[in-house]
């Protein structure tokens, strides 16, 4: 049975949820308090310049591909994606930087040039990171997140020891040069946690970095927001901007309406 559904906010999660709910046959309306959509991924236009004011890294392109595929679409139907080469540079001071290539063999060579033996160590580290990535995408990322028990699968059980160690410990066991250590520890910051608090299993973020590469949508990350907006509208979602939700009416523990 079709339901009338209200979504407050218009960031990535809101637009994604709106698309899936509309596809399921629901009457969906997004209410956004700002004049433009995007949430933390909004865009700033000023004095002839355009800025992404939120995310600037496009990693894990397979996740975006899967999202659009759920609606028989492709990212390329909406925006052009460019793989950055080199991927990025990490600065440690004035004219003191390490360039990260767009492919693993070159990155391995870069590591080896900085610390003897680190190339082989990186290959081993990345093999484990890829294994973790495959498990994360298959068994974890798309779970609803309702219970810690969702983390327990046959595959994750085989990796149980990695949930009792952390990224900082694993990286520093393999690498001594602090530049290499910092390069390998920083990806988990995108998860909102420190390397010392992040289980070793989350090295899959390193595979997202070195294995899948860093990408950039032409015209900026806001292109992805516009793509999701277009898809949502195609699915019948209504989007109201300058619509601040002042109150959620609740009756018998259930939301029954909103005050805008």
Which role fits each region the language model picked out?
Residues 3-131:
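N-terminal glycine-rich phosphate/pyrophosphate-binding loop and immediately adjacent elements
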Residues 10, 16, 63, 106, ...:
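Generic recognition of stable, solvent-exposed alpha-helical segments in well-folded globular domains
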Residues 19-23, 33, 109, 127-134, ...:
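A broad, structural surface signal
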Residues 31-34, 199-203:
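Active-site-adjacent bridging/hinge elements
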Residues 93-199:
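Rossmann-like flavin
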Residues 204-255:
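Helical element adjacent to the flavin cofactor pocket in flavoenzyme catalytic cores
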């Amino acid at each position: 049975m079709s339901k009338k559904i209200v979504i407050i906010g218009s960031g990535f999660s809101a637009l994604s949820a709106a698309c899936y709910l509309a596809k399921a046959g629901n009457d969906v309306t997004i209410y956004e308090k700002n004049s433009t959509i995007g949430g933390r991924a909004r865009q700033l236009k000023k004095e002839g310049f355009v800025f992404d004011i939120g995310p600037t890294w496009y990693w894990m392109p397979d996740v975006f591909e899967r999202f659009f595929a759920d609606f028989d679409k492709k990212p390329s139907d909406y925006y052009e994606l460019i793989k950055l080469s080199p991927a990025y540079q990490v600065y440690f001071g004035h004219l003191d930087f390490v360039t990260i290539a767009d492919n693993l063999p070159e990155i391995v060579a870069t590591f080896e040039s900085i610390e003897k033996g680190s190339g082989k160590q990186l290959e081993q580290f990345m093999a484990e990171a890829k294994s973790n990535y495959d498990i994360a995408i298959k068994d974890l990322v798309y779970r609803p997140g309702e219970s810690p028990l969702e983390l327990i699968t046959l595959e994750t059980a085989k990796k149980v020891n990695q949930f009792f160690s952390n990224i900082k410990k694993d990286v520093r066991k393999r690498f001594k040069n602090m530049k290499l250590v910092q390069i390998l520890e920083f990806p988990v910051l995108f998860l909102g946690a420190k390397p010392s608090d992040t289980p070793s299993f989350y090295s899959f973020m390193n595979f997202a970095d070195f294995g899948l590469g860093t990408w950039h949508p032409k015209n900026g990350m806001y292109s992805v927001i516009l793509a999701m907006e277009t898809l949502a509208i195609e699915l019948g979602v209504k989007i109201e901007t300058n619509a601040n939700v002042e109150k959620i009416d609740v009756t018998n523990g259930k939301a029954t309406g909103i005050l805008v």
